[in-house]
């Protein structure tokens, strides 16, 4: 407290002075360690020491942040909004000035303890920021992102300085330092949050998304350089630092030390430990201790300790398993528990009421709007000179306003050096809040991807000619899904005349730990090091299994892909990838797995929802495989044995059954496959009881007859094919016939049509017992545990442009109605402070069938090619 300030003698423990720099508290530190007569259980108050108070503060901070996060999630706002609101909730203008909060939650005498833990959490959080940033992504081949980034910085810095000076509230002695920190906070762009916004809107793989991310990386790195310069230029009192040359030189030496000594040294040590097979907790503790040591070094150099933590995070080898081990041990605890303390500290420093005493309200609005528009205008003008479309330029400019924890770090750095007083600090905090509120909703509303997905003809197996390549997208969640799908592909008769092109996609759930570098997967930046050990090992094994299938068959090509997405929008990635690769058939695993006793377990409900969504939105035909031991087909049949493998195709009628027949027909070329096609024909009693209109039934029956006739004509001389017709009157007759078939022949695989929305007389009465609508009536019956114990089932739905467009339109209408009503949907939440909720904001494939595009053009989805 400055000399001559009036003392508050009403409280002998501490005195408070209020100035433009906020509340300055002076208290007797010996009171914290005051010896009391009561000992142990005789203590008069359990909250008399700092530890119980800290636990209380930790609980209040986490509870407040969680409540605000859940309240802002339905509005599709980033977690950064909840972070700022959590701090402002306890600001002096809201709850921070109440007697109860001051006395029992955030007393002034324990502020030092709170700030200590908050700063420690910040140091480790910045370390994780550097740990998750892969500098290989800075290898930019185009100059457009670099020009956009530097132009935005060069314009935002002087404009930020002018906006700081415009209200006339800055302290006269701190104008220069205040302009620097205000400008840096305005110019910075938070790369991790920007990447997650693009992931939410399915724009990561768009040209606009790539340009924005590259520009954000350059801006992020330049922000750190400017921040270090700000630390070095000004002393703790906000005036020029006479030791600035020493600070800059020592900091530059430490940077070179990290590049040429620390990084190679850590890489060498970890290479030795991995070779010896010893990577454990000791190495993690070594790294965590190094964070504190590097922070101490940069603090001694004259810059903030977060600089050392960030540089040390960049120094950890990107491809080493230790990165993932550190994130698993540190991320959730840090961002979910300790970081809310930092937000509370930011809020305690902001005083909206105090700011309004010095700031004109109209001028405050002008400054906030100007702060947001400066990057948009700059980016648009720069982009137009580089022939970037206007809509893309506007979207990039809006994304450059993405703020995050780094912006708060800059403001608090200016607050610590007294470069920013309380009104200006509060003013800028509100500006950051407004920018965060506007960016993603504005982008979702104003930017609609102009590119549509490619138009292609072969969207069904039935339309594939005998000498045309069959392109299949095989989806895998976990390793047990692989064996059945690979063996189904093995018996799909890939030949030189009709090759099989397989795109095997490993579906990985997007969680709060997923770093921005994992979201932005490409050929140069491989994301393996960011996976957990289990997922990484599983992904490798899945890729090896599919690649081995390619080695054993010259007529088959395999490309393995890893898709990272939340369950709520995973079907979008599957559909977009299917359209992009021009596949005509998607294979999905059934969500239930076989138990040791031969029955079907409960399964994963999220996987079931994915299957249902894919069936509704798929751009091609879809098959769901219920695997009950398809591995037997490969293990025995491909050793040259003469034993035939029995495949039964159950034909009821309709487009789905015709598609199923086409796929089963393709298998006939395999010398080990024996196909039996059973057509169920409704009897006269069934037609009369069902009340079928003659014209409707005859029209559909005519198409079925033509398909069956063609099949019989072309396979009449094939001894491996058998065709049977069964007359049935209802669903019970159909089930009895299938049971009779099972008793007389042991089938390995059933191929059936889904028969969605079909009301066939031969399945009458079976719909009442259906538990899995995605399998259809016959498929659900065959998949039930009490029907068959060893035969796998492939349920196929044929692509229909009319049905798909209707489903997409209905889904879009539901989304709009849900947004109006405040319905949140099934969006995924994550526990981390940097976690980003996802949303089903738009359908990038609604009118894909009407637009043409180049085959190799990448679309708005995120996936990585496994080499």
Swiss-Prot record:
Q: What is its main location?
A: plastid
Q: Which InterPro entries match?
A: Cation/H_exchanger_TM (IPR006153), CPA2_transporter (IPR050794), Na+/solute_symporter_sf (IPR038770)
Q: Which UniProt keywords apply?
A: Antiport, Chloroplast, Endoplasmic reticulum, Ion transport, Membrane, Plastid, Potassium, Potassium transport, Transmembrane, Transmembrane helix, Transport
The annotated region (Disordered) lies at 848-867
Q: How is it placed in the membrane, per its record?
A: Multi-pass membrane protein
For bias type Acidic residues, the affected ranges are 851-860
Biological-process GO terms, alphabetical: pollen tube guidance; potassium ion transmembrane transport; proton transmembrane transport
According to the UniProt entry, its GO molecular function terms are: antiporter activity
User: In a knockout, what does one observe?
Assistant: Mutants with impaired chloroplast development that display aberrant chloroplast structure. No defect in male fertility, due to redundancy with CHX21. Chx21 and chx23 double mutants are male sterile.
Signal keyword on record? no
Q: Give its localization.
A: Plastid, Chloroplast membrane; Endoplasmic reticulum membrane
Per the record, its GO cellular-component terms are: chloroplast membrane; endoplasmic reticulum; endoplasmic reticulum membrane
Organs and tissues of expression? Specifically expressed in flower buds and pollen. Expressed in leaves, roots and stems.
Annotated transmembrane regions: 43-63, 75-95, 112-132, 146-166, 175-195, 212-232, 242-262, 283-303, 336-356, 362-382, 393-413, 427-447
Q: What does this protein do?
A: Operates as a K(+)/H(+) antiporter or Na(+)/H(+) antiporter of the chloroplast envelope that functions in pH homeostasis and chloroplast development. Monovalent cation transporter with a preference for Cs(+), K(+) and Rb(+) relative to Na(+) or Li(+). Required for pollen tube guidance, but not for normal pollen development. May also be involved in the development or function of the female gametophyte.
| Family of the protein in this entry | Belongs to the monovalent cation:proton antiporter 2 (CPA2) transporter (TC 2.A.37) family. CHX (TC 2.A.37.4) subfamily.
Protein name in the entry:
Cation/H(+) antiporter 23, chloroplastic
- Gene that specifies this protein: CHX23
């Amino acid at each position: 407290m400055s000399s001559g300030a009036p003392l508050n003698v009403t409280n002998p423990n501490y005195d408070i002075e209020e100035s433009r720099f906020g509340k300055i508290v002076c208290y007797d530190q010996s009171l914290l360690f005051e010896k009391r007569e009561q000992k142990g259980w005789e203590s008069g108050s359990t909250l008399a020491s700092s530890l119980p108070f800290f636990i209380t503060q930790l609980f209040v901070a986490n509870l407040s942040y969680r409540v605000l996060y859940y309240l802002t999630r339905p509005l599709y706002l980033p977690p950064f909004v909840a972070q700022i609101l959590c701090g402002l909730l306890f600001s002096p203008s809201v709850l921070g000035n109440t007697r109860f909060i001051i006395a029992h939650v955030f007393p002034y005498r324990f502020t030092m303890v709170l700030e200590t833990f908050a700063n420690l959490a910040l140091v480790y959080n910045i370390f994780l920021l550097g740990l998750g940033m892969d500098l290989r992504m800075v290898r930019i081949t185009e100059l457009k992102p670099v020009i956009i980034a530097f132009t935005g910085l060069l314009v935002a810095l002087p404009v930020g300085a002018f906006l700081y000076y415009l209200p006339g509230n800055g302290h006269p002695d701190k104008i220069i330092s205040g302009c620097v920190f205000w400008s840096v906070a305005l110019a910075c762009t938070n790369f991790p949050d920007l990447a997650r916004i693009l992931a939410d809107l399915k724009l990561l793989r768009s040209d606009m998304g790539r340009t924005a991310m590259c520009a954000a990386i350059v801006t992020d790195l330049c922000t750190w350089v400017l921040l270090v310069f700000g630390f070095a230029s000004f002393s703790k009192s906000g005036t020029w630092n006479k030791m600035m040359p020493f600070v800059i030189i020592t900091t530059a030496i430490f940077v070179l030390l990290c590049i040429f000594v620390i990084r190679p040294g850590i890489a060498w040590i970890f290479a030795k430990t991995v070779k010896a097979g010893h990577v454990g907790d000791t190495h993690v503790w070594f790294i965590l201790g190094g964070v504190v040591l590097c922070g101490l070094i940069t603090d001694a150099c004259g810059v903030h300790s977060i600089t050392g933590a960030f540089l040390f995070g960049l120094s950890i080898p990107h491809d080493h398993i230790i990165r993932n081990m550190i994130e698993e041990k540190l991320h959730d605890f840090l961002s979910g528990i300790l970081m809310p303390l930092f937000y509370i500290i930011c809020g305690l420093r902001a005083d909206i009421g105090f700011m309004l005493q010095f700031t004109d309200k109209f001028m405050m609005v002008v400054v906030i709007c100007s702060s947001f528009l400066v990057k948009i205008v700059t980016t648009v003008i720069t982009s137009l000179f580089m022939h970037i479309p206007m809509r893309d330029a506007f979207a990039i400019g809006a994304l450059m306003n993405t703020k995050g924890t780094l912006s708060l770090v800059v403001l608090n750095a200016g607050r610590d050096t007294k470069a920013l007083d309380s009104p200006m600090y509060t003013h800028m905090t509100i500006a950051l809040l407004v920018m965060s509120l506007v960016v993603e909703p504005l982008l979702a509303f104003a930017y609609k991807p102009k590119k549509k997905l490619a138009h292609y003809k072969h969207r069904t197996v039935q339309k594939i000619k005998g000498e045309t390549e069959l392109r299949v997208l095989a989806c895998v969640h976990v390793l047990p899904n692989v064996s059945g799908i690979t063996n189904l592909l093995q018996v799909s008769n890939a030949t030189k005349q009709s090759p099989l092109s397989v795109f095997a996609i490993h579906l990985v759930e997007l969680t709060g730990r997923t770093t921005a570098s994992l979201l932005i997967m490409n050929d140069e930046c491989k994301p393996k090091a960011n996976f957990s050990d289990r997922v990484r090992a599983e992904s490798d094994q899945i890729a090896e299994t599919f690649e081995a299938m390619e080695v054993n068959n010259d007529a088959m090509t395999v490309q393995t892909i890893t898709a990272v997405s939340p369950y709520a929008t995973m079907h979008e990635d599957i559909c977009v990838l299917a359209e992009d690769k021009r596949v005509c058939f998607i294979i999905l695993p059934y969500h239930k797995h076989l138990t040791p006793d031969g029955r079907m377990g409960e399964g994963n409900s999220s996987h079931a929802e994915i299957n249902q969504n894919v069936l509704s939105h798929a751009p091609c035909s879809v098959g769901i495989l219920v695997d009950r031991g398809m591995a037997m087909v490969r293990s025995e049949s491909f050793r040259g044995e003469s034993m035939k493998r029995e495949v039964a195709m159950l034909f009821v009628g309709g487009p789905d059954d015709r598609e199923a027949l086409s796929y089963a027909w393709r298998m006939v070329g395999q010398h080990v496959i024996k196909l039996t096609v059973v057509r169920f024909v409704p009897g006269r009693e069934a037609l009369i009881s069902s009340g079928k209109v003659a014209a409707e039934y005859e029209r559909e029956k005519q198409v079925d007859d033509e398909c069956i006739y063609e099949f019989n004509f072309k396979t009449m001389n094939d001894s491996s094919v058998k065709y049977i017709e069964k007359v049935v009157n209802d669903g019970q007759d159909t089930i009895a016939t299938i049971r009779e078939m099972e008793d007389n022949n042991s089938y390995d695989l059933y191929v059936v049509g889904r028969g969605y929305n079909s009301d066939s007389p031969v399945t009458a009465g079976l719909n009442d017992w259906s538990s899995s609508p995605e399998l259809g009536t016959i498929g659900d019956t065959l998949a039930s545990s009490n029907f068959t114990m060893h035969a796998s089932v492939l349920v196929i739905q044929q692509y229909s442009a009319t049905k798909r467009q209707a489903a997409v339109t209905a889904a879009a209408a539901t989304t709009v109605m849900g947004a109006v009503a405040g319905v949140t949907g099934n969006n995924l939440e994550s526990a981390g402070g940097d976690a980003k909720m996802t949303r089903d904001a738009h359908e990038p494939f609604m009118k894909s069938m009407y637009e043409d595009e180049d085959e190799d053009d990448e679309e708005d989805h995120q996936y990585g090619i496994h080499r």
